């Protein structure tokens, strides 16, 4: 019998893990997602806009993207149709965007095809599979079958550290919960890391809502309008982000350590010291979380930290190394918290 591998609560809470990468800020993280909507509602236009934006590193749906290679498996289309759609949006070819109209199915070679593509294009960030049914080997839509197929794609996304989005259809019947309208069993929504459901307010109105839910994203309802000239879904309200408080803490810490180089003390003492550079209120019981969860960002700014146990509690030890600061502001003499917030 294989021994169960465990980690203690303290080990997990004090380890700096590689942060989850968002390919579309606040909307799509690494992992497996479902994008569902009624036939001909405009899912393909949304996917194509996402592909082009990620490949070029441009904003989409009002959110920043992580630039990288995008692969779009248009399994219900032809290259002629893809060409026509591309020319509707742009007349300039985009690097780092690739298409295919044929692929193997799940469990019969699809995973290997995507893995091979990742080896050949190491900058791969996202794969769109349009549609789910085109890569399934059978028509069984039971919970077990749905979960089994999707779990293969989830394992692939986790292994390659990429985002995989599977385009799917919604049921015709209405439901007060839009995620219940995703065709198939609850095995689909149960397996994926997130679900996006595009629902038109009225058929043909070109006004819609994109409902979003996921493990690494906040629940959101984004109001959209389809611009027939641009062939894009345009956000008609703002998608708020929740990272502002974290950004203020990191900015304050950076400004403080640029002045003092080092700090050793308790969380309460650190909160007190940060009042030197900002009037923002921080809380000692959140300091450890903020340091651990933003460990990779701190290293980018040349900040190392560790904890030391004493009889009176745990000490936080911080040190700033200018030589290891890879930010573009390290040579700036006067850095303030307000100026730095948007950069962190």
Where are these regions (language model features)?
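Short, conserved catalytic or adaptor-binding loops enriched in Gly and charged residues
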Residues: 88-96, 185-189, 298
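Hydrophobic positions on the alpha1 helix immediately C-terminal to the Walker A/P-loop
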Residues: 46, 50
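Gly/Ala-rich phosphate-binding loop of Rossmann-like dinucleotide-binding domains
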Residues: 55
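Amphipathic alpha-helical transducer elements in NTP-driven molecular machines
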Residues: 79, 83, 107-111, 143-151, ...
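DNA transaction DNA-binding modules
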Residues: 224-344
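Conserved inter-motif catalytic segment of the P-loop NTP-binding fold
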Residues: 2-4, 10-12, 17-19, 23-24, ...
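Phosphate-binding/switch region of NTP-binding enzymes
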Residues: 22, 34-36, 40, 45, ...
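Pre-Walker A (Motif I) flank of P-loop NTPase domains
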Residues: 29-33, 68
């Amino acid at each position: 019998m294989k021994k169960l591998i465990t980690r203690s609560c303290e080990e997990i809470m004090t380890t700096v893990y590689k942060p989850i990468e968002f390919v579309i800020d606040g909307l799509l993280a690494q992992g497996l997602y479902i994008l569902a909507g009624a036939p001909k509602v405009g899912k393909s236009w949304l996917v194509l806009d996402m592909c082009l934006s990620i490949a070029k590193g441009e904003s989409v749906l009002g959110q920043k993207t992580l630039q990288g290679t995008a692969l779009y498996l248009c399994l219900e289309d032809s290259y002629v149709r893809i060409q026509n759609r591309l020319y509707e949006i742009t007349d300039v070819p985009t690097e780092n965007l690739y298409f295919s109209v044929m692929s193997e199915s799940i469990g019969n070679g699809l995973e290997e095809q995507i893995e091979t593509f990742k080896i050949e294009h190491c900058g791969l960030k996202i794969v769109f599979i349009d549609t789910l049914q085109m890569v399934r080997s059978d028509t069984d839509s039971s919970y077990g079958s749905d979960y089994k197929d999707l779990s293969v794609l989830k394992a692939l996304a986790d292994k390659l550290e990429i985002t995989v989005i599977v385009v799917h259809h919604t049921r015709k019947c209405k439901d007060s919960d839009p995620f219940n309208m995703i065709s198939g069993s609850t095995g689909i929504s149960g397996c994926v890391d997130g679900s996006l459901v595009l629902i038109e307010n009225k058929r043909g109105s070109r006004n819609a809502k994109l409902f979003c839910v996921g493990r690494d994203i906040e629940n959101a309802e984004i109001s959209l309008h389809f611009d027939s000239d641009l062939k894009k879904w345009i956000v008609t309200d703002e998608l708020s982000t929740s990272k502002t408080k974290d950004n203020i803490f990191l900015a304050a810490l950076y400004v403080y350590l640029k002045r003092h180089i080092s700090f050793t003390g308790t969380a309460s003492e650190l909160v007190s010291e940060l009042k030197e550079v900002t009037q923002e209120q921080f809380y000692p019981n959140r300091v450890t979380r903020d340091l651990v969860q933003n460990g990779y960002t701190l290293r980018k700014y040349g900040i190392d930290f560790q904890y030391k146990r004493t009889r009176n509690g745990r000490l936080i030890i911080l040190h700033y190394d200018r030589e290891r600061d890879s930010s573009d502001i390290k040579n700036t003499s006067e850095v303030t918290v307000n100026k730095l917030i948007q950069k962190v």
